[in-house]
Amino acid sequence: MKKFAALLAAVVILAGPLAAASKDEKETDRLENCGLIVKEIMDIPDDIPQDLIDKAECIIVYPSVIKGAFIVGASGGRGAMVCRTGEHFTGPWSAPTMMALEGLSVGFQIGGQATDFVLLVMNPRGARSILNSKVKLGADASAAAGPKGRNAEAATDVTLRAEVLTYSRARGLFAGISLAGSTVRPDNGANEKLYGKKLDAKDIIFKGAVAVPAAAQKLVAYLNQKSPKNLSDPESLK
């Protein structure tokens, strides 16, 4: 009996580090996927215009998991958001806050293929709203399908005034897509798993409460190289 108790204690001791290591595994994998998606998409010259990337305050990436012909639960997915640091979004890119995407239309059929979503948050109001609470696209924040091409000159005024520009990639095809009616929100439960403590999304972005985790270093380094400076009108950042 004593031998069994000793063996059980040893198993518990060994299992502890394994459980801790796997606790944030999903979030770590998600961040690595976000980095791959952003680089693959932004390295293609005729996809997201560089001038829009340079004027974005934040970028949200959702690597989606598909079940059958629909997004799982016909509702949404999980991803991450990075922003330019500082009160006025003028600093280097931040550590990520984990995000949720909810309320996708059940009619969003994609033939069983994985679909990635990339959202550009184009002004401070939109960024602060998303960091504060859940935001319904098209209602709480104006949203539009993002334009493609080397620049955004051909985009409509409605598109250029949107607080959030949305893109999708499925079957290797990349396009602007409307996500109006969907909800984006910080996933604070995932943040706690990733960082090992309770954190508010605003603390991560504005206060630099945590360092960039290893799984997100490629994503953040790539964005700092791709778009090191916010080129928005300084007056719009106040």
Where is each model-derived feature located?
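Positively charged n-region of N-terminal signal peptides that target proteins for export
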Residues: 1-4
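Bacterial N-terminal signal peptides
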Residues: 7-16
